[in-house]
């Protein structure tokens, strides 16, 4: 049958709010509509465009139920790993907007495992979001700079500066250098805000290594006076 509302993530976020200090802000994270589409199996809709739209509507419904949150990260590794075809590229911005429009929070579309191809990047730029996220650990980060130079970017950016798949903990100085490198490469672009994070989801990191990386990112953010 059709995709239907679950509320599971909203429930997890409600529980998370109980752990926050009074002045702490909640950040929510979801798969982006294209990556969820790419990883899901369609046994009902029978049409890629309809299935893609249904997934975006489903995610939008989930977001609408979220408790108050300051930032929503939509994770879109599949935009790099399995880039959309031309038809889905043209539907990409609308799908992202379907999700992002259901929150008043700042929405970040974070991509990783490398750089986006030019057409996908250009279409993603049409989405009404606060920031796009870039993998600065990947070897093809020069291609990311090329996209930004050619098509521009948002007024804020999310930078994946720590390796989310390697237990080696980078120093705050190394992470700060990666931020400085990025800013130096595009001097004409001034950002209202930078979000700093691991480049990928740190699923496979031991908890202690994950915490050490977060501490290093926070220290780098303190140097940059940006948001981690």
Predicted regions: what they are:
Residues 1-228:
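Domain-level signal for soluble alpha/beta catalytic cores
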């Amino acid at each position: 049958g059709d995709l239907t509302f679950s509320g599971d993530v909203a429930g997890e976020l409600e529980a998370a709010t109980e752990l926050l200090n009074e002045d702490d802000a909640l950040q929510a994270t979801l798969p982006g509509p294209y990556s969820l589409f790419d990883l899901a199996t369609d046994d009902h809709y029978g049409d890629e465009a309809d299935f893609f739209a249904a997934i975006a509507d489903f995610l939008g419904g989930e977001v609408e139920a979220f408790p108050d949150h300051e930032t929503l990260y939509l994770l879109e590794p599949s935009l790099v790993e399995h880039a959309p075809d031309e038809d889905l590229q043209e539907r990409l911005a609308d799908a992202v907007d379907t999700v992002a429009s259901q929150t008043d929070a700042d929405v970040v579309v974070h991509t990783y495992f490398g750089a986006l191809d030019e057409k996908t990047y250009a279409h993603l730029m049409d989405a009404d979001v606060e920031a796009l996220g870039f993998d600065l650990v990947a070897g093809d980060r020069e291609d990311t700079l090329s996209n930004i130079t050619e098509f521009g970017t948002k007024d804020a950016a999310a930078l994946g500066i720590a390796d989310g798949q390697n237990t080696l903990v980078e120093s705050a100085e190394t992470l700060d250098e990666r931020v400085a490198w990025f800013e130096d490469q595009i001097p004409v672009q001034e950002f209202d805000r930078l979000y700093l994070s691991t480049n990928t989801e740190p699923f496979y990191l031991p908890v202690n290594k994950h915490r050490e990386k977060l501490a290093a990112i926070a220290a780098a953010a303190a140097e940059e006076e940006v948001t981690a």
